[in-house]
Amino acid sequence: MEPGLRRSAWIAVLLVLAVGCNEPAVKITSPLHGSFSTDANVTITGAIANANVSDVRVRVNNVATTLNPDGSFSITLPLDAAKVVNPYLAVMRRISDGKILAKDRIVVHAGTGVADGDFSPQSVALRLNDSGLDQIEPTIHSLVNLDIAALLPVGTTVISGYCAISVFGACVGRIDARVANPPPSISDWSLNVDSQTNYVAGDINVFNMRIDLDLIGSGLAPSCGLRLTANSTAINGNYALQPQASNPIYVDVNMIGAPVVSFQGFHDQFTYGLCNFPLIGSLIQLIIGDVQPIVVNGMQNFLSDPDGAGPLDSPIADAIETALAGISISGTIGQALQTQLDAPLFEVAEDVDGLTLGSDTRVTSSVGTGPGQCNPPKGSPNLAGSYSVPEAFPGFGATSVGGLPYDLGLGISTSAFNQLLKAQVECGLLRAELRAFDLGTGPMPLTAGTLALLIPEFASVDPGTPLVIKLTPTLAPLLTGNSGPGGEIGEIRVGQYLADVEADTVVPIGYLRVAVDFRAGLGMGFDSATHQLAFSIGSIAPADVTVAILGNNINTSEGPLLLGLPTLLSEQLPAIGAGLANFPIPSFFGLQLQGVEVSRNGAFYTLFANLVPGP
């Protein structure tokens, strides 16, 4: 569409919307409310309706515009990158008497955005230190059935037709050796998983292996029983970890080469018969020599990757995969927050202190009653994108930023956090109705009489009339990536938060509409009792509060109200922290989190925690 036609179309739409009430109107048509720009300036275009062009003037942020004959206007104004949230207020006044006829206001974000449905790349980090790997070793152990009896079933022939006795070169006594009852057994086995550079070592120790053999003689060779035992058996293997190609929210684990199997303390003991006959002494060593490689080969075959780089895995690799599936954050956290959270892995990095799972992240809202869905209140915004901040993916060490040991770390970038806030606002976050007010002496019911103490024009309303202040976000709160003004872990900015003062009656009567922008510090802490990341809003300076009066049916004097509201709101707005939904952290591997520290690891907001048994 040509620019002129597009402008005329907007004006036509505006006129149609205004028909029926014939009220004067001003509308900012471009850019869209909540849009993003990296330019130093922004061009504001708009139009008026139901007003005499020759008798009105329009100012945007108190800068005069030139009205075209068709009622349209355009003006270029600065975009403040430091503020991020940039409001633009269009005010139409009648020239003849100076009366304000109409207002419109939008916010433009200085910066880039992540479009709805797109991923924030490299935006979530999940760290599992070696101490955390120690915590999941029992889970891996429980998933592997190390059955020596299956490796050497009863009846397996170990030695066949061995010539035990010979006379003048002729064999006069032969022996077969077969696995006997009771079946081969072990007393226990242990697993030690240890992260190394670019791989994870998975070392198994098998204790008290016992194998009973029947030595079956023929000719002059006797028959007897032999018990072989090994104090311990070491089975050492290395494993490579990477995102699963078919479903990258999970970890794919593959054995590197074959496991190395070695015995310590192999012993022999006759259990029956005459096998201490001197002529067959060498037989014992032969059996021991043949049984060891058979057991070694059996264990290697059992524990090796059956098809190399193919889809099948070794038992230990498969068990590690299954255990690590317990740290997928996509489903559990998303459902708890009533959002659709996708976090496919882009890497699994192993180092000598632990392993780090890095994810791209997408958080969206979905209307419905299913898992991860919500039923937003009427009037909730449907936002085109969220504020994005370029940040480097963090590294992790053996200790937290504060130098404390920990088992697990969970970090999220500013961009991913803002996606989460966007999705939650679309689902109703920060919607509230206030029916009480605290002026420093305790909560009081909100009535026309109490509000008249602040806004004298409410004295014209019956003082007993109950009032309600309806708070409605039009945009998502956003984190800028900076620290808060009071040293808090983050800085949060909220744009165009609407407060409508209405009569709380069957048929509401609107008295006042105020748009509020503010800047504050965001605190974060972990509640180990509820297993949630909790948020708080720090103190707010009046200078960090911007207000605009968009509706004034009570006909209050706007100048004094605009001067007084920032101070009043700076005292009330920190309570908004209670409206920020806590971030539920799921259990991992059946273990609960015990908070160690919440801090910025690099740029990421990171929870460091230990894994402890649940109640």
Predicted regions and their residues:
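Bacterial N-terminal signal peptides that target proteins for export
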Residues: 1-11
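Extended, low-charge, aliphatic-rich alpha-helical segments
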Residues: 111-212, 271-615
